UniProtKB/Swiss-Prot annotation:
The keyword Acyltransferase does not apply. It comes from Phaeosphaeria nodorum (strain SN15 / ATCC MYA-4574 / FGSC 10173). Component of the coat protein complex II (COPII) which promotes the formation of transport vesicles from the endoplasmic reticulum (ER). The coat has two main functions, the physical deformation of the endoplasmic reticulum membrane into vesicles and the selection of cargo molecules. It also functions as a component of the nuclear pore complex (NPC). NPC components, collectively referred to as nucleoporins (NUPs), can play the role of both NPC structural components and of docking or interaction partners for transiently associated nuclear transport factors. GO terms for molecular function: structural molecule activity. GO terms for biological process: COPII-coated vesicle budding; ERAD pathway; mRNA transport; nuclear pore localization; positive regulation of DNA-templated transcription; positive regulation of ER to Golgi vesicle-mediated transport; positive regulation of protein exit from endoplasmic reticulum; positive regulation of TOR signaling. It comes from the Eukaryota. It is found in: Cytoplasmic vesicle, COPII-coated vesicle membrane; Endoplasmic reticulum membrane; Nucleus, Nuclear pore complex. InterPro entries: G-protein_beta_WD-40_rep, Sec13/Seh1_fam, WD40/YVTN_repeat-like_dom_sf, WD40_repeat_dom_sf, WD40_rpt. This is Protein transport protein SEC13. It is a peripheral membrane protein. One of its GO terms (cellular component) is endoplasmic reticulum membrane. SUPFAM superfamilies: WD40 repeat-like. Keywords: Cytoplasmic vesicle, Endoplasmic reticulum, ER-Golgi transport, Membrane, mRNA transport, Nuclear pore complex, Nucleus, Protein transport, Repeat, Translocation, Transport, WD repeat. The keyword Zinc-finger does not apply.
Amino acid sequence: MADNGQNVDLLSIEANEVQHDAVLDYYGRRLATCSSDKTIKIFEVEGDKHTLVETLRGHEGPVWCVAWAHPKYGNILASSSYDGKVIIWREQSSTWQKIYEVALHTASVNIVAWAPHEVGCLLACASSDGNVSVLEFKDNAWSHVIFQACGSGVNSVSWAPAVAPGQVVSASGNQAGAARRFVTGGSDCQVKLWDFSAETGSWQSTQILTGHTDWVRDVAWSPTVLSKSYIASASQDKTVRIWTSSDLRDWKSTVLNVDAVAWRVSWSLSGNVLAVSTGDNRVSLWKERLSGGWECVKTIEE
């Protein structure tokens, strides 16, 4: 479960275990990390100081991913592990507790991602067993749907914005009838789009985007709500593809060539800058030119 740890500066912790993920919460005040030692650590962030305040234990294998829920649901953190389990943690009265644990998958759960809060309290989980599960908290109870997305394993999942291109957000920030939609990347070299059908209560594949020649390691749907949708996909084929569509049906791709395996892609909050992490320990930043095409504007080497 959860252990209260002594206050320790983040930089003073010896890197005895590989760190797999590090994510700030919505306000940037807390940092969650996870590692091969089967634990999750919570740090308070104040300026340049990171103070360890909690160590969460519950997984039986390396923890690959942590994800903060939107603060409207409270201080909620999800974690996924090689052990095939997904755990939901919540802080109450300054104490972290495990509030839900589920083992729907028969292999590693590689990533978990919360949906935009406008569509509900939903968590998508992608697994090496080829399945995606979607957990939902509603009416004080958890439920789930699980389906096969890629027979050879699902490596990544990313939700679409609650607002489709060209739509207008209401003053309250709520989007009536916001669509439940996400994209996955798999070991079958494909990028797939999925929509939820309220009529059948199931998820259906609406698009299969092909072009990569090796595993798709990561996908990221841009948060932009401009005239087009943008999806970035990172592959072991040493390319990143940027897929664009104005109607969610006809997709075009632009290929960005990189010098090593592309592991991760991440959009800026405004959706106009794409960060690409590659196997040569570099992070490159890309922007779309006004005249079209994409250019690398900065490279950061570790």
